[in-house]
């Protein structure tokens, strides 16, 4: 019997070995084996990562080295921008492809591939479009000091200037401010049409944002980037927010994924419905495609396999989303892969797709 193909998951099994995301990853590979797309066994090697912002950069790089030492020929993980920026040079040095969900444009190199759980520039453009479409032309911005926050705000200022959106007030905060309500109160005093949050998302995911808004009694129209998809930490924490999302009920692959998952495991995917299970499934499917297309089962071979993918159907994003890659073009989502969601009464709602605009 041939030796199994080893794939590494660096912090990517979000709820641990045997959890829902591990099941999703295995479902894509099991389907490939059952259909004959993969003609040899596979083995997953999981590492918890424990990287930034709560852990350390060294934990992330040590985790990547561990997976390579275990014989993995590709690694999915380093999903936050902090860790992607940290691990990217190592992936390039060791010639083992890294597939990350990071939104940063600083994930760069021959062996760095991005199935973005957002895009710092794209998020900003869509946020500004939503503001413009809804008549919010004078806004307040909560800008966070973090790799994502800095990048988001740089793009946001550019897009706001382009579309004629005025930034009435800015408050700059860390990822753990001493009193968030004080900063939000300062923004409220500017009497903006809407509130914009530009940051990684832990302020919302930990419930600090909702607590602070409730404390000062402020309920403005509000929007954030793909920090919104930290709703997997609890929809109640994101009540009333619009955000950049990747879950589109009209995508025909969404009900097919749900049907297959239920048939295989007898339960719903984690916190269904939301985008993260779909993104996990597509990540695993992309790895399968890369293995199938690889001229040799090695790091460079998987890289070549990834770079040959074109018009691969995607369950993530809108109905026209597809996945593609080529040499030196490693951002893999194409089409309407970013869209709008809203949390109302503790549930995720579809808020709409990108719409063309005229000068």
Which sequence ranges carry the predicted segments?
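Extracytosolic ligand-binding ectodomains
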Residues: 1-359
